[in-house]
Regions:
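Extracellular receptor-binding modules and their adjoining Ser/Thr/Gly/Asp/Asn-rich linkers
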Residues: 2-5, 10, 55-57, 72-78, ...
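C-terminal interaction-tip segments
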Residues: 74-76, 80, 183-209
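Terminal beta-strand-rich extracellular "head" domains
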Residues: 119-170
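Beta-rich globular "head" domains
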Residues: 37-39, 84-134, 197-208
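Surface-exposed loop/edge segments in extracytoplasmic proteins
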Residues: 62-66, 72-77, 135-145
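Exposed beta-sheet edge/beta-hairpin loop segments within beta-rich domains
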Residues: 97, 164-197
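Short, surface-exposed terminal/edge motifs of secreted or surface/virion proteins that either
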Residues: 41-71
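Extracellular/surface-exposed low-complexity repeats and stalk/linker segments enriched in Gly/Pro
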Residues: 2-48
């Protein structure tokens, strides 16, 4: 059994003053729209991640709807061959979000899954998560010694670097996120090719104004 909550105008709930508390539609109400309470929610039925739910941060007489960006997690597993090619071929972890949007990374978990045969080897190789085209770093250098070269399943938890807070808007807008080897050579070893690296990134997509 279902009940139609919304009327033909896309409005669902209003308060005692008949101001709108909850609504939906294909077009987000314009700035300065009226009759939406502060904190009113708008479900954008044509939206996607980061643009599906909006909240009125303005007033009843002058609305200002802003997207509510939810945190999602993207998991990407790299093969042994991909790990050993990260210097020449960085691996895309999150695709570019679209014009006027940026990816805000909350945390990164790297999981080395040891295949049981032989380890990766490295000398001065480190990893970094960065915005693809601009090369702006999202994290500081992720030390691979004691991590990627282990002969057991190993986990590294990484948080974004504060330096990214000073990035120009053009360096982070509509940019994909990639994992890169910043060392002087490729990671080697694991001749059996049975080690993998699982990259889990928690992130939000925000719309720049």
């Amino acid at each position: 059994m279902s009940t139609n909550l919304f009327d033909n105008s896309g409005y669902a709930l209003s308060d005692s003053d008949k101001d709108i508390v909850l609504a939906k539609g294909t077009t987000v109400p314009a700035d300065a729209a009226t009759d939406f309470v502060t904190g009113a929610l708008f479900i954008h039925t044509d939206g996607s991640n980061g643009t599906a739910l909006y909240v009125n941060e303005g007033t009843t007489s002058s609305a200002a709807f802003k997207p509510v960006a939810s945190v999602v997690t993207k998991n990407v597993e790299l093969t042994s061959a991909e790990v050993k090619a990260l210097r020449a071929t960085p691996k895309e972890i999150i695709a570019a979000p679209g014009a006027g949007k940026m990816i805000v990374v909350e945390s990164i978990a790297l999981q080395l899954n040891y295949g049981g045969t032989n380890a990766f080897t490295e000398t001065t190789d480190n990893l970094v998560l960065e915005y693809s085209d601009s090369g702006t770093d999202i994290t500081a250098a992720i030390e691979t010694t004691g991590f990627i070269d282990q002969t057991a399943d190993t986990v590294a938890l990484v948080y974004p670097a504060t330096i990214a807070a000073a990035a120009s808007a053009t360096a982070v807008t509509n940019e994909s996120v990639v994992l890169k080897n910043t060392g002087d050579g490729e990671i080697a070893g694991n001749a059996a090719g049975n080690n993998t690296l699982l990259v889990s990134v928690a992130y939000r997509v925000v719309t720049l104004v």
